[in-house]
């Protein structure tokens, strides 16, 4: 379990995949998130600064070659996910199992503290529709990233939309925006109060924030060189790959897709709860993972697909 997002409790039926074929519309959904083409290329994947956690397996740095693909410019929004649910009747894991993990400062109801990470509360009734818990709504949050979605919920959306979750390599390549070996999507300079650049926790974590705590609209900050927004902070994003801390030692060079075995799935990007005092996983090389049924108020996703030939390719100039 990571301190950044709690592991989901053991749940009956947790090995069953969500079904999205209720209306015979598999693969036909209107994907309401803008996509951009990322050209084929080669990049150095992994932590070149020695700043990662040993158990996350961010090293060794290794060369990866990828074919072209398209990727969402933003995380999937509440509006886009609502369209999917309206079309399919999909019920998320958090709704099925009766609740989800909510950060304590904005939870609308009491909850049981998650062992080892007491700032996380298991709140009955929390879900994508009620992101802070009972009584909370999506009013004003249409353009915020959907949260409280499990890996299986994200995959169900992808199946409906004819998309896929990005491989970990696709995610990092796109997040780097053409910058070779940089710490962040924008370069090496850390965010500051005067130039925040990303949505992370500011103040004394976890009890004394100096500003609002929570998600922000998906286009709050400037995009990176590939046109992607908020690849650092805001919400963790599910990837397709299974997780192994040893995988970088044996990874394929071309279009790697992760280990063949393993129960946990990769998460990338950090969230609005990252803070350098305990978690600096909002770097582009940072890795995390969780069980596929896990949900929390800082976990979302974006999708990939074949290269969109209707769009002009974006430059990969290194700066």
Model-inferred region functions:
Residues 287:
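Short basic/aromatic-enriched segments
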Residues 38, 44, 48-49, 91, ...:
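Functional-site microenvironments in short loops/helix caps that host divalent-cation chemistry
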Residues 1-135, 152, 177-180, 291-292, ...:
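Short, compositionally biased
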